[in-house]
Every structure is written in C-alpha cells, then in structure tokens.
Swiss-Prot record:
Cysteine disulfide partners in this protein: 47-106, 132-142, 173-183, 472-482
Xref: InterPro entries: FN3_dom, FN3_sf, Ig-like_fold, RTP_Phos/Ushers
Transmembrane portions of the chain: 890-910
Keywords: Cell membrane, Developmental protein, Disulfide bond, Glycoprotein, Membrane, Phosphoprotein, Receptor, Repeat, Signal, Transmembrane, Transmembrane helix
Cytoplasmic side, ranges: 911-1282
GO annotation, cellular component aspect: apical plasma membrane; apicolateral plasma membrane; plasma membrane
Gene, per the UniProt record: dome
Post-translational modification summary for this protein: Undergoes lysosomal degradation.
Protein name: Cytokine receptor
Amino acid sequence: MVAQEQLVLLLMLLAGCRGGANAILDPGWVIPSKVEQLIGGDFNLSCTLNEDYFNGKSAEDCPVEKLYFTGGGRVYRDSKHIRILNNTTILFSDTNAVEQENDYHCMCDEYVINKSKVYVGTRPLLVRDFNCLDYDFQFMVCNFTQPPNTVITKYNISYNTNNDWRYSNTLDCNFDSAPVVTCNLTDDNYKRFSETFYFRLSISNALGHETQPITINHFERLVPARPGQNLTLLNRTESSVCLSWEMPRRSNYNRGLVWQVRVTPQNFEPITRPSWRNHTLTIKDTLCLTELPFAGYNYTLRVRVRANQNNTLWSEPMIYAFATAPAPPRRPPRVTYGSFYVYSSEKAMRFYWEPLEEHELNGPDFRYSISEYRINGTAVDPGLIKVESNSAMIDHWSMSAVHHFLIRSSNSQGLSVNATPMTIGPISNRDFKVREPRNIRSVYHPTNKSYTLSWDPPSDQRELQNYTVFWCVPKPGLQSECEGSIRFAEVASGLHHFTTSPDQLLTLHMAVSANYQSHNTGLHWAICSSDKKDDLAKMEPSIDVATSTSLTVSWSERVCAVILAGYNLTYCQRSAGRPDNCTTVTIDRYTNKHVIQNLVPYTDYSVKMLMYSDSRVSKYSDELVNRTGEAAPSQPRELQLIRVTSDSVELAWKPPLLANGVVRAYEGTFRSLHDNVTDTFRVSASADELVNNEKPITYRLGNLTAFTKYEISVRARTVYPSEPSNVILFSTAIGVPSPPQLYVINNPDQSSRLDWEPPRTPAGRIDFYEISLRDNNASCLTSTILPGRNLSYVMATPRCTSHNPFQLAVRAINVEQHPQLNGADAAEGAVLLMSTNGKGCEARTDALGEEERLQFEAYAANMTAYRLYRSDWGIYGFICTPDTHSVKAMYQTIEVTVAILVLGVIFYLVYKKYRKMSDIGLVLPQGIMETMKKPIDMGGLGLGLGPDSSVSGGIVCTRVDDSPPYTPQDLPHDFSSCGSESSKLLLRTASSSGGGGCVDRDGYDDNHETGPISAVGPPTSYLAMRHGLLVQNDRERERERDREQEREREQQQQQRESEMDREQSCTNGYIKPTQMKSWGGNGPSDNDHTFSVPSTAMTAPMSQPLSQIPLSGYVPVPIPQSRFNPAPVQPFGSPAVPSAATAAAASTFFPPAHLLNMDNYVQASDLHKLKPLVAAPLSQTGGPAFAGSSPATSPPLQLPPVHAASPAAATPKMADIGYTTMEQLQLTGLIKPPLAATVGSPTHAAGGAPGGGNQHSRLQPQINGYVTPQDLNAMAHNRHVL
C-alpha cells in the first residue's frame, strides 16, 4: 500500500512538472502516454487535471468526480476501474488485458482531457516465410511477412557467407509495404558466386527480443534473365521458323541451363515437340520450331530458362508472336446431299457448303470460287453465280435441269488442288408434296442451351436413305439465309429428331432434308418452337414500351401456333409491394404482342404469361414488374386570395388529388386586365405534399402594378402540366406612382409655367399633385398642393443668379383609406408617411378648392386612417430667371481659376529666383582689390580714417548727384533681407571697365578747377571708403540705439511730412538693397550729426550736419543695354548745368515712372530688369547748350563746377555696364523736388555762385532698411560736398 502511494505521488509529481510546461495547451495529463503490455497483463493510467488551465473558470466546470476513461469501445466509470486519488487526479486500472491497439481518453463529460496509446500484444514472433531471389547474378532481393503483433516490433537483418558472425553486413530493408518487408542486397559486399548465405534476424519490441538464423542456398534461388535479348528471325517456312537471341551471362551458370519451349497456335492448345531443342553457343542461342501444323497461321512462342540444378526457379518467359509462311488452301469446302434451298418462287436456288475453319485458310485474301458450272452437261459461265462466304445463289434456276458445280478454296497463294463437286437433279411438284419432311419443329432446352429438331417423315418413304439436319445463326428477318457458317449432320432414316451440342446461341435456325436415292427437295427450315406432345415451355415475355396508361408486352414463339389454343396474360396493380386488383386477358395463338390499356399513370404493375393447348397448360412466366409513365396531374384545388397589397398578392391552394407522377412544380399564369399582358410564375413543389395533399400551399406573387386588376390561375406539373385551377380576379391596392415628367417655360415677368405628364404608372387615382420650389441643396422654399386633374401650373419664381440657382419639381400623390391598420400594415404605413418628410416646408393648399382643401387636410391630419403615397420628384434642373449670363459666368469662372493658377506658378518661380540670387557672395575684381590696397586719406571726414589708419579695404563706386528732398516716413525700414547680387554686379562693373570707374572718380575729386561743362549729363562721382567701414562695432550698436530713440521722438513729424510728400509727388520708389551694412565711425563727436569736409574747390571749409549714412547700401546695378558714360572730367571750365538735350536724353533712357512709384517696390537686384529707352543724341558743345537750356529743364539740384578734359572727350563712350545713378532717378521724375530747406544751397541753381561760404543744409535720411531715391541723392550730395 505504501509502495502504491509512493507511485501515485511520483505520478502526480511528473504530472505537475509536465503541467508547468504545457499549462497553456492541455487541460490535463494522462500518464503514461503510451502503454505496452503482454496479453493478460495489467496496466494503470492516471489522469490529472491542470488547475492552471481552469483558473478563472467556475469550479463546477470539471471536478474530479466527473472524470472517467473511454477506450476500446467501452466507457469506464465504475469503481472497479476508476479510483479518485485527490481533488485533481484519478487512477484507471485494467486487469487481464486482451490484445488491442487503442486510444484511452480521459474524459470530463463530453470533453477530452488527454489520451494515452495502449498496445497489448506478445513478445517478438519468428518469421515464417523469409525468402531470397538472385536475379541473374546482378542483385538479391529478400522479403518476408511480419507476424501480426499489436506491439511495435523492430527487425534488424545481417548476413555473411562463411557463418563467421565476427564479420557480417547489414541488410537494407523497406517497411513501407508492411506487413510485407522487402530487403535489397546490391552493394559491394554482395558475394555473387557464393553458394550459401547466412542471415540473422534480430527481432525486438518492448516485451522481449528474439534472434532467428536463416540459411539460403544461393544457387537454388538464382533466377536467370528473361531470354530473347536481340531476338532475330533467321528463317520461316509454311511449317517452321528459326530464331536466334543473345544471353550475355550464360558463362556464370557453371552447371548449365534448362530450357522450356511452348508453342501455341491461335485458338488451340499448346503443342510440344521432342525435336525442339535449343542449340546453345557461347553467347547466342538458336531455336528452330519445326513440324508446325498450319501454314499462314498465327502462333505464340513462350521460352523460359532456369539453372541446371534442383529446386531452381524459372526466369520470366520470353513471349514472341509469329506466323508461318502462307500456302494455298489444302482442301475445298465440304458439301452434303440436300444442302440447297429452293425459294417459294421456284426460280431461285441457294446451295450451301461448310466453310473452312480459320486455321485452314493458309493465308490472306481467302475466298470461295466456282471453278466449273454445267447445266445438263453444258458448261456455263461461273460468273452467273453469286458467291458468298457460305453459300451461292442462282437467280435463274430451272427445276427441270441438272446443275453441276465444282467448288474450290483460294487465297493469295492460289486455288486449292482439289475441288468439291455438287450436283442438283431435277425437282418436280410431286416431290415437294410427298418427299419433304412434315411438321418440322425445334425445342430449346434452356438448361444446357441446346436445341432439339423434330419432324414427321415424308409421305413417300420409298428410296429414302437418310436425313440431313442443318443449323446456323439466321440473318435478321431472313429465315432461309444464315449468318456465318452452316453446320450439318446426317440422321438415319428411322430417326425423326436431332439434338445439338450444348451451349448454342439463343437464336438458332435449324432445317432438315430428306435424302432419296435419285431425288432430293433440299432443306426445309423449322417454323415451330415446340410440339404438341412436348411439354409447353415456360414463356419469357418482355415489356417493350411503357406509357402513362399502357404497357406493351411481347414474346417469342417457342412452339408452333397450330398446336396452341392461346395465351393467358395476367397484370396486377401493385400497392405496398404486393399484387392487387389483377386482370387476366386471353390472347390469340397467332399473336406475339399485346398492349394493356387504361392503366393508372405512374403506378407499378406486374405482368406474367402462360401458353395453353388443348391438353396442357404451361407454367406462368417469371413476373415482370414495371411502372407506367407519368401523366398530367389533376388540377390544383381551391385557389384563393389571402392578402393583397399594392405590389403583391398572397395566394393559397391545395395540391391535386391525383398526382399521376411526381409533382415537380406549380406554374401560375396571371394577366393584367389593364394592358392585357400575361406573365407566369413557378413554385417548386415539396415532398410534404405527397404525404398530406390537404395542406394548403401558399405563395407570395410580387412585382405587381398597383391599382390594377388581374386574373390568375395555377397549374400543377409533373412531366406534363395539369388543367388550370379555378380563376380568381383581384385588384392590387393603391401604391406609389411613378414621377411625372416636368416641362418648364420661363416667362419674362419672373414667373414660370409648369406642365407635366401624368405618371406612366399612376398606381392609383392621382388625387393630388405637389409643386415645389427648391434651392441648390434641394431644400424646399415653397410647396403647393394641386388637384389631381391639373397638369399645368403658373407660379412666381424669384430672380436667381449663378450663385443662387433653384429647382422646380412636381410629384404625384395617391390617397388610400385604411380604417384599421395594425401590425405590418401600420409599420409600412408609418414608413411611407415618414419617407415623405425631409428637408421641406409646409405645403400650401390655397390652389385647392374648398372641398379638396378640407379633404387634403383631413388626409394629412389622420395618418392612421389614411395612407398617402407620394411619388419621386420630377425635377426640372437648375434654372435662373433670366438666365442670359450663365454661359458667360461659367467662362469667367474658368478664366479666374486659370489666372490664379498662372500667378501661383509665376510667384513660385520668382521666389525660387530670389532665393537663388540672395545666396550670391561678394567677390571683388582684382583691379578693385589693387586699388583698395592704396592708402587713401579720409581724415577729412572726421571718422579717423586717414592715411595712417590700419583699416584696409576696397572702394565702392557710386554716382553722385544733387540730393532730392525726402521724408523719413517714405522709408519702410527693413534690413532683414540679405543677398549678394550687388557684389556680383560690382564684379561685373570692375571686370568690364578694367577699373576705369575709380580712375574717373579720382579725376573728378582731385581736379575741382572751374571750367565749362560739356553737354553730356552730370558726371559720375565716387565715394571712397575703407573696407572697415562695412564692419559694425560696439559704438555703432550704441548709435543704433540712439537712432531708435530719436526715431520715436520724430514719429509725429515724420507722419506729417510723409503726407506732404505724397501730395507733392507720387513717384517715390523704394530700392531694397540686397545687402546693407551699418555705418561705422571712430567714435562719438561733439555733434553726432555734423562733420567738416575739406574741399579743394572752395577757399573755406564747409561744415554741414550729416546723418549716419550706410554708404554700402548703394549698390551697382547692371544695365542690360549699353548707355552713354559721362564725359571725362575737364581740368578747367566754368560752372554749367545740364542742357535741355542732356535732360531729354536722360529722360528717354529710363522707363516710365510708374515702375518705381509708392506702390511698386523694386529690389536693387531687380533694377537691371528696367529696359533702357533709346537715348537722344547729346550736344558736343557745352556753352550753348547750357545757355539754351531753360530753367524749367534744369535739374532741381546742380553739381559743383567741373572742368572739361579735352574737346576729344566730348565724344560719349559706350559701355556695357553702368550704375543706377541719381540723374537716372531725377530725370525720370522718380525723386521728389527739393524741400524749402535745401533751396539756396551751393548746389542749387539759384545759389551756385562761388561764394560758397554758406553752410549747406545736409539731408539726413533715416536708413533702416529700404533706400529711396532721396536717400541716394543725399548720399551723392554729401559726396559732392566732400
């Protein structure tokens, strides 16, 4: 008991360990999972529930009390087999186990917890049929059958050839076709020439182990290869053939070989000859088959061979088909006395012979021929005789003549040597009367399938020698002709019957002839099946044709009709498998067919027959059972209506009383009385109707037209349709009409005339029409109810535009009264009424008469008693009144859309160009770099930039011109945009001019002698500055903050001045530099806004206030087309002003002023896009041109006097690059006129005297982002003062 508890605990422990691994997959475990036990032994199985699997489930899902086992077709629940160990485990025990191989399942109710495979069998059993075969010394195959055992058994086979098991080899076996095991021995260890093989079978399973030794005589198990390799036919004659073939491994058989030769003629038994020996050579074998019986005949040769040793095995046979050489037929056909037949016309005769057998034909193209034909000894052409395979026919036969024939056989090799003579003597009418057998009859014996022919002797038996009996297979419908061979036998004159051999065909034609010494009337065919004295045979009728009401029965004649009194035919209607209501009919003896009439369709009938004579009655034939065909059923009954709706009707009827077959379907026909259209429907029949034909059949016919009269009937159909049922008439209910077709005519007085056609499908009386005016979203604006008789209406329509179109719509309304609505009808009515609501407005009824209005209000107010069916809207598109610009508006919309798309694309391309140009860096030309290395004295600026300054840099060339007035309000300050276009343009300027621009500047700045000015435009001046001026320092940042504070104080004044400037001029433009650096200086001065500039052209220094001007903001801009350069600086001359021609030339060079107005911001990088105009020719003399110029054409600000260099310099120089200079802005009117504060300055026309001791008023632009033309003029003015 302790040991058992320990075993249970061990099993539980194993179950717990296994459950930890499979807790997710298995609801429990069965241990062990496989059991192998001896028959009669005991075994135990434990089943443990997996508690983790049942977590979260109710405890009653599978308690341990519900566990049980099933296996081997049994259920184990009792305490004898099941014992509960704990709250999760049970133990199953089985004693005295029987042989089995089953799955045992641990079950909880109908669910499987787990299973175990149980094998109960025996220890290993010894093999009984181990055998090996060696195939022509090539390989060995061994096989055996595993003894039956339910316990899995393994087999290991080893072998050797000297019985020394220290050295053995393993045999490779295939168990796929178990229980038959096949082992192959084909490796290099195969000892082909060893006589003995020793095998050892090691057999083991879970119940034991066995070793079985087996010894095989190798040579006795040899199987030679099939002979016939490279078979050759050496010779062939009419009775022999010689063959030759190879056998390569003949030398391996030391004791020689034994041959077996069998020759089988076609359709004969095999024949053997002791002389048929195999002439064996070293490699080839030669066999000659002699004394073969048939020429030109087919034979089959079978040759096999075995080793010349006892108990050896035969090889596979060589099978060879051959034919002997053909030869002429050996004999003619046989004939007998009386083997001819005289036709009833007595003018044609056919004579018969016995054909040769197939093996006697001796070759192809076999036939029979008449080699000689004589009539009364006179030779006649044999071609007059029609020769067939077993007979010949003479059409013009004479009964009084003697006919003599010679019959031969022939084939492709020629005629037979011998001929069969046949002579037919004259026949008289008396011979036909007294010398022919009488009452010829035959009896068929079905037991052995034989026939017996009987006859009565002729009236005249004198000189009667014997009888000849003939039999053959008759041709269909021809009693006097045979199909195939005719056989005959002689019968003694004292016998009057003949029985054929057994196993004859069912239809056999027999005849007999009476042979006299000098007379013969030929053969006479039997026409009777039996004799009176014989027992009447059981008939074998057959049912040939079955219709719905008749059966046609036929039978064959077994006896002559003259011996019969008639036939009895009995037929019975079968119910419940038994005959019932039988009827017997008597049939005339000369009849072989009868039709049974007036039968019930689709009913089983049994038929049997017998024949009777005056003295006998035959046994009834075997009963034939047949079923009549199907017929049309009776009509369906009691067709009636159950429910009618607007589009359907529910019908009911009862099945027909007489099905007369299988009712497959019901076919209904319904006709609309409105348009006389007929349609059909089909309802499949069910099997329940065969059981209960009183149960009504219901069908719902849909897709009907509302408010229409119909007539309907139903037919039942088997194979044929029945008569129609009763016809019923009904009308469908009122329904939803189809939408009217609306036409609208727009009137000029903002009204529209609506005309519509009635609904094609009114589905009712059309009580009302509803007219609706709706907006673009199909929302109702107005709705009007009209009487159902109205088909037109004029209504006011509002004026609409393309942004506010509207629709006109009309729909029909039917009203149906339903005093009681319940169930599905009420629900359907609610749906119909609710479907009419939507985005709408309240319908107006003022167009109705008083009575009609009250009716409509009553209908609408009482939805439970009335049902309103509204059709879909008949809509007349979107209209406008008037609608003359709809097409134009559409085109305008398209144009605006296209314009927006084009502008978007242009903006995107400009933005990409701007981004690309803003990334260009400043690279100065080499010439400018060299100039920047020279020391330049700028100490006069008061900025600490003298010759000794350590700040190095380049020079920026700019054009100097009189400064125009400006106001700070004109400047939208913005320095956030950076770019390098100016550097690129500066590089182009330097490279194109070769640095000449700065040379001109030096000539202008260093030679301030007075002299006349040429007629060219104002000269170009330059402002030289160090590269360090472009660098911003801390002091500059402080000044920036000061400027911001000052800007706030002057904001109000700037606004007022900006308004004045806008009134004076509207041509101010803005030039956004691509890059601006802050202005820098050495340090603060006493007055941040003033500094003194010495001038070589004046006797006293002039001091003017100057704002912090970022000189780097004025950038060179390329001119796409060349323009005139200013004249070179003259060393002497008097002050002058630009001439009118100069101003005109400058004004014609630039584009119109509207390109740079207050609303047109232009970046500096875009100035090169301004196309220059054609320049006017300039005057070559300065004085007259100046004198001739009027004050109106003089610029508002004038430059200091300059000197002409030489007369030759008056010729303008063409250049392909220029600068955006102040005179360009002035002459085009882009700058503002000078303010009052600047009038009287030395640069003004009125104050241009040399007495320039007066202080010039310095323009102070607030440069914070954008540069205006005024700012650039101020820069030029300050440079000139310097």
